[in-house]
From Swiss-Prot:
It comes from Corynebacterium efficiens (strain DSM 44549 / YS-314 / AJ 12310 / JCM 11189 / NBRC 100395). The keyword Transcription regulation does not apply. GO terms for molecular function: GTP binding; GTPase activity; translation elongation factor activity. Residues 6-282 form the tr-type G domain. It is found in: Cytoplasm. InterPro entries: EFG_II, EFG_III, EFG_III/V, EFG_IV, EFG_V, EFG_V-like, EFTu-like_2, G_TR_CS. PANTHER family: RIBOSOME-RELEASING FACTOR 2, MITOCHONDRIAL, TRANSLATION ELONGATION FACTOR G-RELATED. It holds the Pfam family EFG_IV. Belongs to the TRAFAC class translation factor GTPase superfamily. Classic translation factor GTPase family. EF-G/EF-2 subfamily. Gene3D superfamilies: 3.30.230.10, 3.30.70.240, Elongation Factor G (Translational Gtpase), domain 3, P-loop containing nucleotide triphosphate hydrolases, Translation factors. This is Elongation factor G. GO terms for biological process: ribosome disassembly. Keywords: Cytoplasm, Elongation factor, GTP-binding, Nucleotide-binding, Protein biosynthesis. GO terms for cellular component: cytoplasm.
Length: 704
């Protein structure tokens, strides 16, 4: 356990599904001495893929936190999933990382999920280096991939290595800083060290050209280096590395390395790059939070054991022996087993049981959790994802994480009475672990409805209910998570709630206005939502201050069940303009009911419409099936955004309603003899065409 934070790296490995993330992580663990036998994703032996479903499906679902060492540096790695349905795992891990390795498929370049994960990393200001993997694959093209990093991500790639050979003949890399060739000739066993050679003659000119580009970029990073470089002076290797590191930490450039993790070529230089260029907790610097007593006040904590404790819980996982594991990034201060900490998000004190550093699903006990590191805590009862843990005498709330709403739902019915009880426990445990997994009772049908980020997400959750909690249940067909909103403002709607039933009565009068509300993300204040805004415009104490939050709460209750078909309302601003109260008969409950009813009446007059989730779909297909594929997209109410050439095939980009995409994988296979593939990510909500909306509403209201 290192105390020198300069030698600690908290990094994530992020990529599109199947770009080779988990294999890259496995190789890193082997080379850093943790794994004696290397695990392969395709035979279900990977260390970080430790849930049953991950082993079966060969994809990574849960970010496992793994600690390893390289050249006296400690590297904490979070292996993040690349499948779109698990974006919440990616968001959670990025929030607590200092840097990341973005892995790209050397043939495909930047893929849709790579773009989404890249955007998420940019949102959290995570510095990155890039690894172009699968250089041994048929059709692998390093220069094409670097081009896609620039064109599709709008990033500035800094080429650090050139490949020697490609596809089967990929033998190694040219190191552009040292100007040497590192080769792993032929079939290399795992653990094989690179042979250092002179650069092959046919690559010397190209290497010289790319080194000049690299040095020009380095020179531009400071006036002093620029004067020296363009004055003809040689820059030293330590100077070049220090300048690149500074640019990476500031997210100005993204160094690009290459190799094939599966064939054990290029992994050691990648590890060197993690240490050389990605930031330590000291580079990342102070973490900001807000004062519990006064949310207007910003507090900071330095990454030091001597500061008061501040830490963020970023993941909950169930452990077969210890029960609930809470994965925590400690930003400042230190914690020991048995110590009491404050969960400032919930306002509750928690006692820390045991502390571990995790190696996938194996645990190593530690005596002290130090600043700047990642640990698993045992014994925290009330802490959930996104909560802050801190020193009870110096409370702080760190910026929380925001998670997307589910876009797909299914009804779930337990088969027997005992399954009913087990289902309750299973749902509670899974919802604790995963904030994008939701559950509610459909009041009309009496069914339990669970929601998630896609069909695979819900499949995995239902699978876990069966395996881990032994719940047998019938699962309904997927349903789309529609929303409702309003299209026109309604002004000064008055509603009076009055009840006289012996003794004290109930009285509350409110006058509200509502209007469509869709602010741009950058216009929102900290903690504000784009879904709903409440404004209090009451003057002169016509409604006492203590009743105002009740009106707000009543409106928020009413927003859960929309006017058209009972779907949640979004993008509405409500203003409380005026009202009246009674000294004896008014109460918080009366104002809550008045707010709720006034809002419902206003929505009915505000031209309510139905919204549906639209997915951004990318289909890669051989050219001969283009007509079929495009015709099929059009028949699904899809809109083609663009068509382009992609590595001997055609790439079709489209926006398609989610309701039209169920079962698409089978349809696409049969239309293209299994030669096309697709990926989709959630794009936005859009208004449902009138004729389609009428059917959805009729079906929902039981009048179809």
């Amino acid at each position: 356990m290192l105390k020198d934070l300069n030698k600690v790296r908290n990094i994530g490995i992020m990529a599109h599904i199947d770009a080779g993330k988990t294999t890259t992580t496995e190789r890193i663990l082997f080379y850093t001495g943790i794994n004696r036998k290397v695990g392969e994703t395709h035979d279900g032996g990977a260390t970080t893929d430790w849930m049953e479903q991950e082993k079966e499906r060969g994809i990574t679902i849960t970010s496992a936190a793994v600690t390893c060492f390289w050249n006296e540096n400690q590297i904490n790695i979070i292996d993040t999933p690349g499948h779109v349905d698990f974006t919440v795992e990616v968001e959670r891990s990025l929030r607590v990382l200092d840097g990341a390795v973005a892995v790209f498929d050397g043939k495909e370049g930047v893929e849709p999920q790579s773009e989404q994960v890249w955007r998420q990393a940019t949102k959290y200001n995570v510095p990155r280096i890039c690894f172009v993997n699968k250089m041994d694959k048929l059709g692998a093209d390093f220069y094409f991939t670097v081009g896609t990093i620039e064109d599709r991500l709008g990033a500035k790639p800094l080429v650090m290595q050139l490949p020697i050979g490609a596809e089967d003949a990929f033998d190694g890399v040219v190191d552009l800083i040292e100007m040497k060739a590192l080769t792993w000739r032929g079939t290399t066993e795992i653990g094989t060290e690179a042979t250092v050679e002179e650069i092959p003659a046919d690559l010397v000119d190209r290497a010289q050209e790319y080194r000049e580009k690299l040095l020009e970029t380095v020179a531009e990073s400071s006036e002093e280096l620029m004067d020296r470089y363009f004055g003809g002076e040689e820059l030293t290797i330590p100077e070049i590395k220090a300048a690149i590191r500074k640019m990476v930490v500031n997210s100005e450039v993204y160094p690009v390395f290459c190799g094939t993790a599966y064939k054990n070529k290029g992994v050691q230089p990648l590890l060197d790059a993690v240490v050389d260029y990605l930031p330590s907790p000291l580079d990342t610097g102070e973490v900001e939070g807000i004062d519990v007593k006064d949310p207007e006040v910003t507090l900071t904590r330095k990454p030091s054991d001597d500061e008061p404790l501040s830490a963020l819980a970023f993941k909950i996982a169930a452990h077969p022996f210890f029960g609930k594991l809470t994965f925590v990034r400690v930003y400042s201060g230190k914690v020991e087993p048995g110590e009491q900490v404050l969960n400032s998000t919930k306002g509750k004190k928690e006692r820390v049981g045991k502390l571990f550093q995790m190696h996938a699903n194996k645990e190593n006990p530690v005596e002290i959790a130090h600043a700047g590191n990642i640990y698993a805590f045992i014994g925290l009862k009330d802490t959930t994802t996104g909560d802050t843990l801190c020193d009870p005498n110096n409370p702080i709330i760190l910026e929380s994480m925001d998670f997307p709403d589910p876009v797909i739902q299914v009804a779930i019915e337990p088969k027997t009475k005992s399954d009913q009880e087990k289902l309750g426990v299973a749902i509670q445990k899974l919802a604790e672990e995963d904030p994008t997994f939701t559950v509610h009772l459909d009041e009309e049908s009496g069914q339990t409805v669970i929601g998630g980020m896609g069909e695979l997400h819900l499949d995995v959750l239902v699978d876990r209910m069966k395996r881990e909690f032994k719940v047998e249940a019938n699962i309904g067909d997927p349903q789309v998570a529609y929303r409702e909103t309003i299209r026109k403002p309604v002004e000064s709607l008055s509603y009076t709630h009055k009840k006289q039933t012996g003794g004290s009565g109930q009285f509350a009068k409110v006058i509200i206005s509502i209007e469509p509300y869709a602010p741009a993300q950058e216009e929102l204040e900290e903690g504000e939502s784009a879904i709903y805004k409440f404004e209090n415009a009451v003057t002169g104490g016509r409604i006492p201050k203590e009743y105002i939050p009740s009106v707000d709460a009543g409106i928020q209750d009413a927003m859960q069940y929309g006017y058209l078909a009972g779907y949640p309302l979004v993008n509405v601003k409500a203003t409380l303009e005026d009202g009246a109260y009674h000294d004896v008969d008014s109460s918080e409950m009366a104002f809550k009911l008045a707010g709720s009813q006034a809002f419902k009446e206003a929505v009915a007059k505000a031209k309510p419409v139905l919204l549906e989730p639209i997915m951004s779909v990318e289909i890669t297909t051989p050219e001969e099936y283009m007509g079929e594929v495009i015709g099929d997209v059009n028949s699904r109410r899809g809109q083609i955004s663009s068509m382009e050439d992609r590595a001997g095939a055609k790439l079709v980009k489209a926006k398609v309603p989610l309701s039209q995409m169920f079962g698409y994988v089978g349809d696409l296979r049969s239309k293209t003899q299994g030669r096309a593939n697709y990926s989709m990510v959630f794009d936005s909500y859009a208004e449902v065409p009138t004729n389609v909306a009428a059917d959805v509403i009729a079906e929902r209201n039981g009048t179809a």
